[in-house]
């Protein structure tokens, strides 16, 4: 959108700055200036910019160009890209201009205050504050601040701070009688928490008001000792900078090959087997770039991986290390963003998918570890970007180099290397010289026929677990499904518990006796009897990590067993507790979902068990073979990483499956040849581009009418390249029905032209009032 700039504002306005604009009669929003020009738009009325929010830019030129590319390539409005890139504290959402704002009063731009859970409504807070002396003006300030901060019902607001407020910014003396921790709002009430301190004066209230609120239990006063450093801080005071790790001969050769590759190409793919020491090579490359004054971005697929690596990176690079992920507080994310925006180089940014959207001036190197992981793809909401591919584009915009690393590279990256677009560097030896783990297949059908199965475990796996425990070794077991069982069924009438808003069965979680939907979050207690026939015969079917944990505890009662999945690691503390205990040898057996496959380095693990390989092999997707190989090789690579060869036991009903043969031999090249040949025959990536198109609406009949009409229009333009419409495996989520199309675009065809045609055809459909409420969700390069 185009807005007018008045003469007084013009000298101080630059691209990348945040400005406030008015949309509608009383709504104000913030945007970022992407271009300054004197070309009049097609529409007549041009609204003026209300004010400039900051004195300096909030985005770099490279960021703006990257956002523009993301918007165009991933078919997403530029405003949504901006919202994804900016930390919450740097966004100014729409708010209504009310009497308070018109009179000049502004909500203080400071962090939220934590309230006691007993204060559950605005009326209660009004009553308390009204009883205080001098309460009238202060009552208004506090209540309106809390409402705008999200603790109490109120209008949309612009109370998110444009400047972060770090804990060390204000001394304790600025606050009455000690320090007051600030908190975060909880669902349905208020919860105590911790966040940066704020000066009492910033709220415009007296010490008496604060004391009265504390006495009445609304606020809680806690004296805190300021802690330097920490996982998400910039500096580690007194940190010892360790010498760089010594590279083995094979690592040194790979390091030199990467440097040579960068001389001729922008991207290098490092294919190193599990345990080969890719991280040591990364460290040497990072040190070289940091010493030259450049910034380095080190991207990981999961938050779960950051804890182990951050400690290690800080040992080498000290306070140059910056951490960025979604579990940081809003204030911390804003602080990191501001710090990087002003950076003059020499920073190592360790982050997950969203870190590619940070301001990174003087960017010199991007390292994407475990580049094959599909968690680099944003799938749940727009912009649906692939962070690995976006990182390659970002590096190109900044004149930086990109290193992609994996033991099992994605077919897309491997194909690019085979075609000469990337340089391929191989690292085939393990760091310690230990052989890759021995892989054993255990036939579940044969074990059942012979009576060699107990619970969900074949005799071979149980024997190996017992042997490892006797020798004081640790075991990791992989089951790619959390919960106790996938569904509950009535043994009398066949009734199954289903989600009322999604077309899926509810997963039974025995720990809290609940049935949960893993799509929308709906949960309900397990009924004592069948709601359909009244029989007392509800049976859990299938098995998840929780059920595996219970069964193992019965078989090995003396073993210490723990579980790492989305349920047990909802908080950073829960995750760290589980990993730390296993790392210190306090846990004998660790059961987990895909979280345990991601690059962990535990020296005492001698055995890895994969409980159900068939679920991976039989998944209805053209990438199933590739992903099954990657998962099994990655989780298997956790075994035997130090002084002795480990073992991997894979339970399967298909022991002759070709992918399992490739896993047993560790033959990535054979797997890649097979997968690439199949995809070339049936025209799938990397031999074409894919765009998934999902239509969504609450009325199933109307949705299919719209889908058939849209499909006819698409087929007239794209012909046989269009697949669908079809219902996805889960065709209703959160009360909305789904219909999908898949569009194939040949490499030689223009993807931009195809996207332009798609947008035009959907606009035509939307012009029909009957289908105006039907949503289109495009997903470019779906995973």
Question: What are these language model-derived features?
Answer:
Residues 698-700, 744-751:
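Helix N-cap motif at beta-to-alpha junctions
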